[in-house]
């Protein structure tokens, strides 16, 4: 499914899990991959990547989030598969208006949330 449909994937978890998962996903794709730096703008129109790896999306500035939403909404732009990563859960940021809900749902067609039990916000709440 990941090869034919190429859904956007949001990977949440510790650095080792994220790196391993991204490596596995990249290995499954036969085309070129672009690794963007943190808080990077969307690629220019001449990028021929089949996959974009967008790290640490939880740290995208509000302006950068708007740029990504505009880019993803532009029907005239070819959109590669996006693998976005975060070491912290992004949905709480959406609920507190610190992260665009539109962007969140565009980036996580598939959500791989692999926080350990010790990292989970629910567990931390119970321990208080």
Predicted feature descriptions by range:
Residues 1-93, 114-127:
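AAA+ ATPase active-site-proximal loops
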Residues 97-119:
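A short helix-turn-beta junction within AAA+ P-loop NTPase domains corresponding to the substrate/partner-engaging
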């Amino acid at each position: 499914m990941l090869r034919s449909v190429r859904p956007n994937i949001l990977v949440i978890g510790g650095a080792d899990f994220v790196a391993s998962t991204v490596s596995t996903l990249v290995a499954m794709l036969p085309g070129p991959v672009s690794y963007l730096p943190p808080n990077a703008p969307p690629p220019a129109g001449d990028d021929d990547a089949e996959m974009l790896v967008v790290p640490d999306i939880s740290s995208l500035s509000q302006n950068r989030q708007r740029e990504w939403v505009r880019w993803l909404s532009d029907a005239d732009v070819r959109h590669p598969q996006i693998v976005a990563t975060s070491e912290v859960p992004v949905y709480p940021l959406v609920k507190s208006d610190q992260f665009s809900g539109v962007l969140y749902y565009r980036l996580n067609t598939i959500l791989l949330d692999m926080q350990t039990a010790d990292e989970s916000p629910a567990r931390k709440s119970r321990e208080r």
